[in-house]
Regions:
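Conserved ASCE/P-loop NTPase catalytic core
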Residues: 32-640
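Long, basic/Gly/Ser/Thr-rich N-terminal segments
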Residues: 1-40
């Protein structure tokens, strides 16, 4: 299907369908969604979650304590926000059941750039997916069920059409009351339309923002009289009223109130009755206007605190369902957020050197975590990401211990994902000759930006400390391994020679025999053999050489039996491979000709250098980055 046909089909699918009141009631009998509340339709749009048994994944089992967690496909790209999303869904679930949440404002509370607006936007998109039914021509999208009285008609509607009585508490709008009078009480003259909520047309989805303290009034929520119509209608006539307020437009849908607590308190008053009683008063002297929708608000913590501390606002506080939306605290998930942002920009095709996003993520999360007791902050970050530190940091605690000590406000401060993304944008564009990112430029840009942001002195020192004391040394170790593996592949023959020599020396040393080198005629006694073996073992810090040598010789003897009497390849035994790699990599003089970008002394060296660069490029670096990172690594190594 081409794009034009696809658009036409979508437009046709969401067109209004008109029907009689009798047909609508028959539809109610067939399909409970015909009379569903906004919360029920939202649940339908969100859909069923997929469950993940975290016992089957070592990393997730540590993070979620072996629990079965729910993941909602509708929020698949909201990484690291499982708790917040589950609370939002719980709100809709309880509201759909007709519980107290139905009468409350869903309030997303969190730091700047933490994802509140993204959740709100996603909920508005989901609201558009399931249609609702309204009286045709109603300026407030009111439900046809408002025409019926629960006391008089409830039993009949429940028996004949299966409509539970709790759906019959809606009232008629003043506009519908006037039409009913005009029709002489004949409800059959009302027509019903099936409509899809629409953000663009402001049908059952609306956004309200705080205005100026002096000129914003309740009309932004409840509407006001239309002066142009006063020539035809009296001021208190429902037809002279402009139902353009947020509560009017969002009936049977969702009203988003951005930065709600920045609005003057007088503006918020209609929300009290709209949520609790399902209706609100307009600015003119006619009856109440129905409201059966969801009010979604969000703001930063500072506004919430000042609002909460004002005793005059107690009536509101009891009508708010708070969902905290903290920053992501898991490195792996934070990386996914950056990848998503980069993917949706022109940087998606640019080279991002391995370790860049991880370093940015680690820095961001270090700023968000609360300092633990008797443990390092870096270890806490690794534990939060599901790593097992049992063997590497005996002082590391369990994830629950860290959380208990940190309290409920962890993740509500630190640098935002928005800040991190701006840093990454600068890093990608740091080099004027190529659009690419690498960790060395990232560290430089981070330090510059920390100074420019004018944080408090102690915060600035702490953040710079994260870069210099935690991230830089670990990156030096990481890039060292990257260079090492690319370098060693140029020396597979050299590695095999060391392996064969080590095995021979160890075998003679164990048997306490002298060894004569067949090429040079040199003789090694047990002491000389030990000295040669230690040259290989010492860079790797082998604690018990005797056991290690026995272990290696036994392995090689077994391997020879199935390899026609030949030694296995030097990379086949992980323990000895590591020892040989460290031995080969311990001598910078041997390393320099291959990884440095100076003029080469021989064609052989030049070939090895080219092979090294090619392998680094295959790992995900540009040629320019290979040079920069190698030079940075050699400088760091020299200074240490």
């Amino acid at each position: 299907m081409d794009v034009i046909s696809h658009f036409a089909a979508r437009y046709e699918r969401t067109r209004e369908e008109e029907m009689s009141l009798e047909d609508y009631l028959a539809e109610c009998k067939r399909n409970p969604l015909a009379y569903a509340t906004a919360a029920e339709r939202m649940l339908k749009a969100i859909g069923e979650p997929t469950t993940i048994d975290t016992r089957n994944d070592p990393r997730l089992s540590r993070i979620f304590a072996n629990k079965v967690i729910k993941v909602y496909p509708a929020f698949a790209e909201f990484y690291g926000m499982e708790d917040s999303i589950e609370q939002v869904v719980s709100y809709f679930r309880h509201a759909a059941q007709g519980l107290e949440e139905k009468k409350q404002v869903l309030y997303l509370l969190g730091p700047v750039g933490g994802g509140k607006s993204s959740i709100a936007e996603r909920l508005k998109q989901l609201m558009q997916e399931v249609p609702f039914y309204a009286i045709k021509g109603s300026p407030v999208n009111e439900s046809p069920l408002g025409l019926f009285d629960i006391a008089e008609d409830g039993a009949i509607l429940e028996k004949e059409y299966g409509i539970p009585r709790r759906y019959l508490t809606r009232i008629l709008s003043p506009w519908a009351v006037k039409r009913l009078e005009e029709y002489g009480g004949d409800v059959r003259r009302f027509r019903v339309v099936k409509r899809y909520p629409s953000i663009l047309k402001q049908i059952a989805v609306c956004k309200t923002e705080p205005g100026d303290e002096n000129n914003q009034d309740i009309s932004s929520l409840v509407g006001k009289v239309d002066i142009r119509k006063l020539e035809t209608f009296a001021q208190d006539d429902p037809d002279a009223y402009s139902y353009a307020g947020g509560l009017c437009l969002a009936n049977q849908g969702l009203l988003e109130f951005v930065e709600m607590f920045k609005a003057p308190i007088k503006v918020l008053h209609p929300l009290l009755t709209a949520t609790q009683e399902g209706n609100f008063k307009g600015t003119e002297g006619f009856g109440a206007i129905p409201f059966d929708g969801i009010i979604l608000a969000h703001s930063n913590e500072s506004e919430w605190k000042s609002f909460r501390n004002n005793k005059n606002n107690e009536a509101f506080l009891d009508r708010v369902y708070i969902v905290k939306v903290p920053y992501c605290l898991r490195v792996t998930e934070e990386i996914k957020i950056y990848e998503k942002l980069i993917r949706n920009s022109s940087l998606g095709a640019a080279t991002c050197a391995p370790g860049t996003l991880k370093m940015m993520s680690q820095f961001a999360i270090l700023t968000r975590l609360k300092e633990p007791e008797n443990s390092s902050l870096f270890s806490k970050m690794l534990v939060y990401d599901g790593e097992n530190l049992k063997d590497t940091d005996p002082r590391a605690k369990s994830i629950q211990e860290y959380r208990d000590y940190a309290g409920v406000d962890e993740g509500m401060s630190g640098i935002s994902t928005r800040f991190a993304y701006k840093i990454l944008s600068k890093v990608f564009n740091f080099d004027s000759t190529e659009v690419a990112a690498n960790p060395v430029h990232l560290m430089y840009v981070l330090e510059q930006q920390i100074e420019r942001e004018q944080f408090a002195k102690e915060v600035e020192q702490k953040y710079v400390g994260f870069v210099k004391e935690l991230l830089a040394p670990r990156y030096a170790e990481f890039i060292g391994k990257e260079i090492q593996t690319a370098y060693l592949e140029s020396y597979s023959e050299y590695g095999q020679n060391i392996f064969d020599r080590y095995v021979t020396y160890a075998d003679y040393w164990i048997q306490d025999h002298e060894y004569r080198d067949t090429d040079t005629g040199e003789v090694f006694d047990r002491q000389a053999l030990n000295a040669e073996l230690e040259k290989i073992e010492k860079p790797a810090g082998i604690a018990n050489p005797k056991d290690f040598r026995n272990e290696i010789v036994n392995f090689v003897l077994r391997a020879r039996a199935s390899n026609q009497g030949k030694n296995p390849v030097w990379t086949s035994y992980e323990k000895l491979r590591t020892v040989i790699e460290k031995k080969m990599f311990s001598n910078t003089e041997e390393l320099l000709p291959v990884i440095s970008f100076n003029a080469k002394a021989s064609a052989d060296e030049a070939k090895k250098h080219e092979d090294f660069v090619t392998r680094m490029v295959a790992k995900g670096y540009t040629q320019k980055q290979v040079r920069l990172l190698c030079e940075w690594y050699l400088r760091v190594r020299k200074s240490s």
